[in-house]
Structures are given as C-alpha cells and as structure tokens.
Swiss-Prot record:
Pfam families linked: Methyltransf_4
CC annotations in GO: tRNA methyltransferase complex
GO molecular function, one term: tRNA (guanine(46)-N7)-methyltransferase activity
Recorded superkingdom: Bacteria
Pathway in which the depicted protein is active: tRNA modification; N(7)-methylguanine-tRNA biosynthesis
Its biological purpose: Catalyzes the formation of N(7)-methylguanine at position 46 (m7G46) in tRNA.
Residue ranges crossing the lipid bilayer per the database entry: none
CDD domains: AdoMet_MTases
Family per similarity comment: Belongs to the class I-like SAM-binding methyltransferase superfamily. TrmB family.
Region (Disordered) residue spans: 1-21
Coiled coil keyword on record: no
EC main group: transferase
Name recorded for this polypeptide: tRNA (guanine-N(7)-)-methyltransferase
Length: 226
C-alpha cells in the first residue's frame, strides 16, 4: 500500500534552505543532472528507479552528500535514495554524484517526510539519519524530525530486519531518539553495542561532524526493524 503526500502543518524539521550563492558549476549540475536523478514527486516503486538493485537504502537529510555518496560508491548494487531540503547541500551532493560517476543515487530536493509518504510498505532495506538539526532549545523540540508519528511511518516503509542508524552530537537528542524509537514496538536495538561513541566500521565522517557543533561527542544509535 502506498501513502499519498501527507500535510506537515506549519512546523518544519529543518532550518534555512540556502546559506550562500551556489557556485556556477554546481548550479549547472542542479539544472542538468538533478532532473535526471530526481525522485518522482508522487507515490513510486523504488525498484522502478533501478531494477537491478539488490537493496534500497534511504538517507534522510544528507547534508553535503559525503556520507551518501561514499555509501553508494561502496555498494554499487544498492539503490541509494537521499532527501535534503537545503539547496547548498543538494548542490554539493550532485557534484559528488558527477565526480564519482555514481549511477545508483536518486535525490529528492525537499522534505524527506514527503519521500517517506510516497514509499510503499516494507520497501527500504536500510535507513540513515545522520546529524539532523537538533532544535536543542526546549521550546523548539517539537520541530525535531524524530517524533512518534514519523517513527511509525519509518516502521511502515522499512522491511523486517532493516537497519536504522541515527547519529547526533547533542546528548539530549540522542536520549530523545532512543526513547521515541524504542517506544514503537516495531523497533529494537540492533545489538549490545547499539549505542556507541566510536564510529561504526562502515561510517563515513562528514564535514558537519568534523565541525563539532554539538554538546557531546558523536553518538551513533543502531536500531533494527522487527
């Protein structure tokens, strides 16, 4: 069963959409390459985007695209779908796709919740949410991406046994996420080392992570869809 685009109300889970002018080369890629690799803006079957894909992975809020591109490069047999509302991040990501000649990346420039709403049930094999906007002030917590209703939507689109990795460098957001994800009976911790500060073996460090803007060392959380 597919779900149509859902209204999100006035609350955005992300901040400003553009911080600086896009470089001419990146703008050219936004104009030419992005339309070729864009995700449909309506309910779709991921396998139609890459019929030969062995798995389908989703990264929500890919920032500059370093992590997404690196994961896609290591697994050319995987269709990597990424969603990012920040124009500069999308511009950086399409540059990575072009420079690395990646054929297995598809991008949505906009709210990831739309993509999740368009996906069929049990269609995603692995999910990444890496260092999302923390909205660390208490009065802004309601804007955080990880909310019970969204966790339920993630449970809908993830296959049984699918992995879900979340990373943050804000201690409160790590605890917030653990509480809300595990409150959904569809999820459990992946293993005894599901909460860690040391980067997992397959992690790719990003420029945002290196800036150390949070209030703690990075926390990596690994969940499994039951």
């Amino acid at each position: 069963m597919t779900h149509p685009q859902q209204p999100h109300g006035p609350l955005r889970s992300f901040g400003r959409l553009k911080s600086r002018p896009v470089k001419p080369r990146q703008q050219a890629l936004l104009d030419t390459l992005l339309p070729q690799i864009a995700v449909p803006t309506a309910p779709f079957q991921p396998r139609d985007l890459m019929p030969e894909a062995q798995e389908v992975w989703l990264e929500i809020g890919f920032g500059g695209g370093e992590h997404m591109a690196a994961q896609a490069g290591k697994r050319p047999d995987v269709l990597m779908i990424g969603a990012e509302p920040f124009v500069n991040g999308v511009a950086s990501a399409v540059r990575h796709v072009e420079e690395q000649a990646l054929k297995n990346v598809r991008i949505h420039e906009g709210d990831a919740r739309d993509v999740v709403g368009w996906l069929p049930d049990a269609s995603i094999d692995r999910l990444f949410i890496m260092f999302p906007d923390p909205w660390h002030k208490a009065r802004h917590n309601k804007r955080r991406l990880v909310q019970p209703a969204f966790v339920a939507e993630l449970a809908r689109v993830l296959k049984p046994g699918a992995g879900f990795r979340f990373a943050t460098d804000w201690a409160d957001y790590a605890q917030w996420t653990v509480e809300r994800v595990l409150a959904d009976p569809a999820f459990r911790f992946a293993d005894a080392e599901a909460v860690r500060n040391a980067p997992p073996a397959d992690h790719v460090t990003t420029r945002y992570e290196e800036k150390k803007l949070g209030d703690c060392a990075p926390v990596f959380l690994d969940f499994v869809r039951i």
